[in-house]
Every structure is written in structure tokens, then in C-alpha cells.
Amino acid sequence: PADAAAGARLSASRCASCHSSSEAIHSTVPLLEGQPKAYFIAQWRAFRERKRTAPVMVTLAAELSEQDVDDLAEHFAALVPPPTAQAAGSDAGRALADRLRCAVCHGPGLKGTSAGAARLAGQKVRYTTWSLQLMRSGTRPHGSAAKPDPLLADLSNAEVESLAAYLASLH
């Protein structure tokens, strides 16, 4: 069984230096607090299998055991994301989230699901903008799609930024 306390110890020694809540220091590294366990484990496997290619994460994924990953996932899933100090989301960003029906996959309040959808609420603006741009181009899979995401394909950069700001404003 997963051990959240062991995950907390691993997080302190292996994760916290990059995955902090500071937008200024690590704006392109996601917050992990509150991410559903299934999502965390799926992303870890993607790094291990090199379907996602951040060099530090690929190396770390190879070093940690399945038990370590389960412990980390249990730890992060149990945490409440820190309040964001980011600007309030725009009405345009909210309208885009509604139009794209983000909650259908990402759950009520866009807090992720036990089925493995990521928590979008409260995520860093810059990280979310970057991720949406990669999914829009097909560089990063969105769900099971390994091609440009049709939901995001027609969004302008300004719309992507508006959506990211709105998502960051949620808690």
C-alpha cells in the first residue's frame, strides 16, 4: 500500500526544490499538490517510458521504484494546493473553459478526477500556457490524443493565455 508519509519524505528530498509554489522561480514547472493519484502515476510512467522528455524527470523516473512513485502520488493527492497569488481570471477565460467543456474530463471545479484527468485549478499560469500550446500543436499528448488537440487547435495565443489565467485563478 502507498505511504503518504514516505512520499512526503521523498518529496522533501527529491521534488520540492523544483516543484515549489513560487511562480517567479519555477514558472514552467507544475504544482503537484492536489493532483489526482492516477494522473500523477500516469505522468510518471510517461517520463519513465520517454513519452514525456524533461531530462531531469526522465532521469528521476528511472531512479525511483514503483513503491516510491505510489508513495509520492499518495502524498501529493492528499495535499491542498497553495492559494495562488496570480491575477484573477478573466471572463473570456471562463467563457473559453465553458465552451471547451473542460469540466467534462477534468471534473467539477477543474480539480482533476480519480480516472486520471489532471487538476487544472490553481496551476501556474506560465506552465499552463506552455502545456496548452504543446497540446495545441500535438507536441504533448492531451489525454490519449498524440496529435494536435482539436479542442485547442483554433485557439489564438491570446486565448490560450486567457484560459491559463482563468485556470490559475481557481482554487
PLM regions and their residue ranges:
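Electrostatic cytochrome c docking/interface patches
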Residues: P1-S11, I25-P30, A77-D98, T113
